[in-house]
Amino acid sequence: MSESQSNAASAASQKWQPRLALLVAATFFMEFLDGTVLTTAIPSIAGDFAVVPADVNITMTAYLMTVAMGIPVSGWLAERVGARKVFCAAIAVFTAASLLCALSQDLTMLTAARVLQGAGGAMMVPVGTLVVLRRTPKEDLLRATAYLVWPGLLAPVLAPLVGGALTTFLSWHWIFLINIPLGLAAFIAALRLVPRGAGDQSRRLDWVGLLLTTAGVGALVVGLELATAHPSEPFGAVSVAAGLGLVAAAVLWLRRTSNPLFELNVFGTRTFRATSTGGFIYRLTISAVPFLLPLMFQDGFGWDPLHAGVMVAAVFVGNIGIKPATTPLIRRFGFKPVLVFASLASAVTFALCALLDSGTPEPLIFALLVCSGAFRSIGFSAYASIQYADIVPGQLPSANAISATLVQLAAGAGIAVGALFLRLFSAPGTFEADPVAAYRGAFLAIAVLMLLSTADSLALHRQAGADVSRGRSGAPKAANP
C-alpha cells in the first residue's frame, strides 16, 4: 500500500494528532521567521562584509526565490520518496544551512547558504502541511489548520523584535544560530511523531512541467522584487511578463501530459477553485498593508522608525488577539458569511486608513489597525481551512503544492502592488502639497481590490465547506464544479 493510500485510511479511522500539527507549525514558524528576520540585521551584515546595505538584499531575494521555486516539486517528492523522509530531510537541510549562514565569511557564501536554507524551507512547509492533512479527518480539519495558521500571523510580529534584539545584544550570526537547537529538537520530534509510509517508486518526474513551473515562479518572484526595489526600471516588468508566459506554458503542458508534475483537475473542485482565486487576492491585499503603513507614518506623518513600528504592531495585535475566536466564528456562521464579512470589513478599514493624517489621534489609529488585523486574521484562517474542505486524499499533494505556491506569490505580489499604487498616485507636485495624498490613493486602491475577493466569496455555495465548519465526517466528492 502506498503512503497516500495508508494515510487516507488513517485519516478516516482516527482522530487528528495535535502534537503532530504543533510540530509542523513550529517548523513553519522557523521558515516564516527566516524569511523576514534578516531585514533588521542588514546594516550589521553589510558592515562586516564591507558592502553597502542594498547589496545584502540579494540574500533575502535568493531565499524567497528558492522557497517559491522548490514548492511545486514538493508534492511529487513526497509521493515518490515518502513524506516522512522528505520532511525530516528538509528540517536537517534547513538546520545545517542555518549553521553555514552563521559561519559565512562573505556575501557570496551567505547567499549560497541562504539558497540551501530556502531549499529546506521549500520542502518543510508544503510537505509538513501534507503530513497533517493526510492524518486529519474532515471534521477536525478546522482545528488542525488553526494550528498551522498561527506561524504566519505571529512571525511578522516577532521578526523585527527577535532580529533587532539578537543583532543588538549578540550579533547577526545568532539570527541563524538560534535555528540549530530548534531544528535539532524538531528533527527528533519528527522522527517520533511523523508516521512511516512507503513512497510510490512508480511516480516518474515530469521534467518539462518542473522546468516550466519553477522557471515561471522564479521569474515572477524576481520580477516582483525588482519592481518593488526599482519601480522606474523595466527589468521587473519584463521578468514578471516572462514569468507569466512560462506559467501559461506550464499550464498548457500540465493539462496535456499523461504524467503531470501536479494535477490541475483540483480546480474542478469549486471550493478550491474559488478560494485559490479569491484567497490569492485576499492575501495579496493584506500583504500590501504592512508595506504601506510604515512608509505613510514616516514619509507622510513625519514619525521616526520606532514610532511607526510600534503603531504597525497594532495590526498584529489584532491578528493574535482574535485568533481564539476564529474557529468558533466559522463553526457558528459557516465559511461563506465569514469570508464575505472578513473581506468587506477589511476593505472598510483600508478605506478608513486613507482618511488618516498626522492630526488623527493616535489611539484612534491604533484601534483602527487592531480591527484591521483582526479581520485579516479571520479571513486568513477561513481561507486556510476551506481550500482543502472538498479535496479527496488522492488530490492532496497537487492541491497542497498549488496552494503553497500561490501563498508565496501573493506575499511578494502584495508588496509590489502596494509600491505600484504609490507610484501611480504620486503625481508631480502632489507630494509637496500633501505628503499623504499618494498613500490615500494607494489605500483606496487596495480597498477596491479587496472587494474582488468579496465578490469571489459571494459566489460560494451557502453550505460550502460545511463538513469542515460544522465538524461533520464524510468523504467529499472528487469534484464539485
Task: Report each predicted region and the residues it spans.
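Intrinsic disorder in cytosolic terminal tails and internal cytosolic loops
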Residues: M1-W16, L458-P481
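Short loop-to-helix capping motifs
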Residues: D48, V52, D106, S171, ...
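Hydrophobic transmembrane-helix bundles of small-molecule transporters
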Residues: T168-G278, W303, I446-A447
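Transmembrane helix-loop junctions and nearby membrane-interface residues
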Residues: A102-M109, L191-V194, L224-H230, V251-R255, ...
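Alpha-helical transmembrane segments of multipass membrane proteins
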Residues: L99-L100, A165, G218, V222, ...
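N-terminal membrane topogenic signal
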Residues: A12-R19, D206-V208
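12-transmembrane solute porter fold
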Residues: Q17-I42, P53-A62, T66, V73-G75, ...
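Helix-loop-helix hairpins in multi-pass membrane proteins, especially solute transporters
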Residues: I71-V208
